[in-house]
Amino acid sequence: MSTSSILHLVREDLRAFAGYSSARTSALQGDVWLNANESAWGNPADPSASTRRYPDPQPQGLRSALAALYGCAPEQLLIGRGSDEAIDLLVRGLCVPERDAVLVTPPVFGMYAVCARLQNAPLVDVPLVDVPDGFHADIPAIVAAALASNAKLVFLCSPSNPAGSAIALDQIEPALQALQGKALVVVDEAYGEFSEVPSAVGLLARYDNLAVLRTLSKAHALAAARIGTLIANAELIAVLRRCQAPYPVPTPCAAMAEQALSAPALEVTRRRIAEVRSERARVHKALVQLPGVRQVYPSQGNFLLVRFDDAEAAFQALLEAGVVVRDQRAVPRLSDALRITLGTHEQNERVLSALQRTQEAAA
């Protein structure tokens, strides 16, 4: 796809939109900064006075570190307040209300639908297919529905939350080919570090109608810092940056994130990812052997989706043991399911023990 065709997917009224020009976006130099109406003094709670200045809208050190981590150029990357902001920017930037549709694959992360509804964009559901080896995306059905509905955005969550399944790149590629010039395919890789499937970022060199979402909230343990990343065609990134709030990345969060991407920190993160993968296999094996457990879905994430004969009893037993899991029973097609995040070995043992006691009491 050419640059002109990728920009053709952007709302007509935003293609030349200049956005807000903040004081930090100017290239002026000096050592006395009086251009942003900031305080000349630090707050007593901030002895270093480092937070009295507005932050860099896209911190260059962090942007470079994230680009190195994800294997893209810095200009292909937009940092935002979690993946949620990137999802919202994509929907607002590409979808004309009441005209351009957003396609999702339920059961799936709810923010795609929330953002679509806030934009009054038509929502198209192509449910995941529930087969004996887990939930799977029906790519031919997704492509057909996207073309029939004139969808502007197609969200593919891989690994999928809460289903846990990942989409192989050789399945994503036909969707990119079929939807060139018609829709942007957004691959949400929030749980990508836990997956054995390679990142879709490698496909960007061939497909400009691809965007990839990443986050430091999961594997990198920085959920409170709200550091999300959108990776896409550089021209599209530039347009969306102009649609973004002026100062999306607080300075303390950027500094912490940059430290988290240092070599020593990344080594610790890699070890913890390996531990999660090991625990995922162990807990999966233990759960399927418990009476009352109907099905444990294979997972490429840091969680397991589990169906129970009595999900209410299982949920209450875990609460009584002090364990809070995600109740999925209000989600269509998951009325008997709980999503259990993988914790430490000791935390996972607590889950298994509580569920074992429940089944023994019911016997």
UniProtKB/Swiss-Prot annotation:
Disulfide bonds: none
Catalytic activity of the protein: L-histidinol phosphate + 2-oxoglutarate = 3-(imidazol-4-yl)-2-oxopropyl phosphate + L-glutamate
GO terms under biological process: L-histidine biosynthetic process
Cofactor entry: pyridoxal 5'-phosphate
Signal peptide annotation: none
Pfam families to which the protein is assigned, alphabetical: Aminotran_1_2
Residues the record lists as N6-(pyridoxal phosphate)lysine modifications: 218
Keyword hit for Transferase: yes
Ranges annotated as spanning the membrane: none
Pathway annotation from the record: Amino-acid biosynthesis; L-histidine biosynthesis; L-histidine from 5-phospho-alpha-D-ribose 1-diphosphate: step 7/9
Xref: NCBIfam families: hisC (TIGR01141)
Alphabetical list of PANTHER family matching this protein: HISTIDINOL-PHOSPHATE AMINOTRANSFERASE (PTHR42885:SF2), HISTIDINOL-PHOSPHATE AMINOTRANSFERASE-RELATED (PTHR42885)
Quaternary structure note: Homodimer.
Family, as annotated: Belongs to the class-II pyridoxal-phosphate-dependent aminotransferase family. Histidinol-phosphate aminotransferase subfamily.
Annotated protein name in UniProt: Histidinol-phosphate aminotransferase
Organism: Xanthomonas oryzae pv. oryzae (strain KACC10331 / KXO85)
